């Protein structure tokens, strides 16, 4: 049986490049996004270019009924070997300048839909005793700006969720990778989705979607659990992660810290 990869947010940017690269590796594809015309064009192009079977699945992952369609596919198709949880969006503005609906929409796509799809995919992976889950987070998972409180919060969830799954599935043939891109040349900037134009960013700080995905897949091949496509010194992450563990260990004390002087 041929292996199938499901890619969300596949109509452009990082998702479209994942679709291309996975097709080149011989995967059949299910391409998930809101824009049906773009999906159909991409699917046809990949079918011709690589001789694989790519099919579009039009779904808005901010809509519960559409998420359920993708969940059903993930639980019913035994050929599915990989899920790339790429769909997401961010509005970079202060909470005071954001509508509640907009903030909740980010949470619905970046957290709720991602979790539902991961849950559905992992059910199938466990039954088949193998699979690959790739969750796309962001460098803002570990850094907040005055304009990124909601977006950073959603991506911090993706990182923590993925790390927990990695521990949960450590002794299985199911791989979980979390990818944390920095600024990447995608429609989140060029189509005004973020609220900040691409021209406002220093060009040397912006990575192409192609380089981002190629680095992420190289990290997957190398067995990385956490991939930072733009970070040259991997020791920085190792130090960060070790410090996180040390801080957690320091919380496991049943008494207030001496600096609070509660004994006086």
Regions found by a protein language model. Give the residues of each.
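Conserved glycine-rich cofactor-binding loop
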Residues: 11-12
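Conserved glycine-rich Rossmann-like NAD(P)H-binding loop of the short-chain dehydrogenase/reductase
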Residues: 25-42
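Conserved NAD(P)H cofactor-binding loop of Rossmann-fold oxidoreductase domains
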Residues: 86-91
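Substrate-binding pocket helix/loop in short-chain dehydrogenase/reductase
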Residues: 94-96, 102-107
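Active-site helix of classical SDR
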Residues: 118, 154
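Residue(s) in the substrate-gating loop at a strand-loop-helix junction
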Residues: 138
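C-terminal helical subdomain
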Residues: 178, 194-236
């Amino acid at each position: 049986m041929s292996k199938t990869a499901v890619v969300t947010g596949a109509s452009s940017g990082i998702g479209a490049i994942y679709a291309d690269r996975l097709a080149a590796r011989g995967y059949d594809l299910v391409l998930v996004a809101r824009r049906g015309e773009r999906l159909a064009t991409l699917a046809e192009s990949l079918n011709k270019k690589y001789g694989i079977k790519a099919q579009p699945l039009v779904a808005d992952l901010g809509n519960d009924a559409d998420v359920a369609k993708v969940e059903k596919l993930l639980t019913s198709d035994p050929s599915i070997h990989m899920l790339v949880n790429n769909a997401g969006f961010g509005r970079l503005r202060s909470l005071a300048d954001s509508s509640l609906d907009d903030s909740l929409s980010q949470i619905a796509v970046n957290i709720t839909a991602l979790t539902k799809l991961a849950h559905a995919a992992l059910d199938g992976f466990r039954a088949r005793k193998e699979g690959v889950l790739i969750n796309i987070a962001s460098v803002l998972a570990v850094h907040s700006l005055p304009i990124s409180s909601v977006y950073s919060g959603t991506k911090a969830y993706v990182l923590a969720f993925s790390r927990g799954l990695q521990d949960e599935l450590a002794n299985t043939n199911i791989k979980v990778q979390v990818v944390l891109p920095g600024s990447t040349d995608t429609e989140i900037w060029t189509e005004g989705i973020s609220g900040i134009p691409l021209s406002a960013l220093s060009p040397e700080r912006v990575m192409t979607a192609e380089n981002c995905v190629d680095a992420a897949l190289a990290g997957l091949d190398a067995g990385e659990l956490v991939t930072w496509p733009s970070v040259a010194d991997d020791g920085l992450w190792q130090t960060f992660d070790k410090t996180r563990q040390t801080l957690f260990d320091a919380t496991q004390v049943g008494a207030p810290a001496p600096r609070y002087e509660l004994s006086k």
